[in-house]
């Protein structure tokens, strides 16, 4: 994605239910994060800061242990909610990639993380030009069936 100058933000409509983070089990065993790359995915930086609920337990065996993440159960679950990550101008005029990661320990889990929609503000046009469709499907091509399926 190419971003023009100005502020860049990501609005996630999502819901999550990760193991832990409850009154009965206050330890955050699992969680989800949003990461960004400016070098085509060679390395990734954690973004999100204040939108996260807490840190993943540091002794859980989770690959994200000790890091901030969406943990526990989202507000109003199973309804979706919107969290906005404002990155300001830190990525202006750069091509970036976004990655959504879930880290878990090896024990029992919960429902997980569902991303319903994603809205980017401050993003440039993802494609400079649109290419016309030069071919079409052939409705008269022979059909091939295998394994007795006809």
Give residue spans per PLM region.
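Beta-sandwich/jellyroll recognition modules and their flexible linkers
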Residues: 1-150
